[in-house]
């Protein structure tokens, strides 16, 4: 391992011990904001500290085993060779783990996120598939102990949704789901298909981090066009007799957000503004990323329908991720929310790309 990396790790361990000491300080315990911030830092440093300590122990084990290999006793020398092999394997594994733990963290990864699903090409079947995707993500969220909150929805005529915007509340929601952005294609025989022909339809998914209230940039009132209208669809008689639905247009960017799920116009406006802030921030981030993009691939989808990331093939029971050439024959389980086998390989590939980029810089 490079001396610069070892030095960085040693300084992180020092900081971990310092934070550990501070958390026992009565003045810190009495300051809830400071205590909360230090507790978060402590938990972030704990994993890398434990990993580095295990790495140091493996190095010590290797030295001890190499010394044992010099013994006169043949049985001891044979035992030492096994220990040398085990220590070297541990050092290699822990080195890889430490490099990943040292990768720059996306500050948004720990945040809640907005999940937008839109029916694309494929008519009624695309709307039904949008409903299937929302159910899949909802089941996955349940397994993670997260909470799904519908922000806005537009139901399709024959089931499912034309559009669904939901907020996913939970630690690490954005970091886990951010690679879901892009085009999702389904191949299956629709229930209404008498000839048994396979149809292809598509949906687009966009995942955006929630912007905390304190960090929302000021949006000028003059930049907004706010329309109220009567809610359509589910919600009961009361909803349909008042202009409770809200449509907000951000004039400088042309971004439009509608919200009609709440009975209260005030609540609909608050929800729409939070989605609008996330969309504006995402548009700015996409622009920044495009300006500094290089020849490296970007596994983070754009949410554009042309950016196809995954195919769900029902006749073959398979799901394929086109970004990393991954195919799993577990379609039923995936649609029931068992998505980790699809999510983890993309995250690992992204980390490998980050490591390659760092290697090029050094």
From Swiss-Prot:
Superkingdom classification of source: Bacteria
Keywords per UniProt: Cytoplasm, Methylation, Protein biosynthesis
Residues forming coiled coils: none
Chain positions with N5-methylglutamine modification: 237
Cysteines engaged in disulfide bonds, as pairs: none
Disordered, as annotated region: 289-308
Family matches, as InterPro entries: PCRF, Pep_chain_release_fac_I, Pep_chain_release_fac_I_sf, Prokaryotic/Mito_RF, RF-1
Name of the molecule in the record: Peptide chain release factor 1
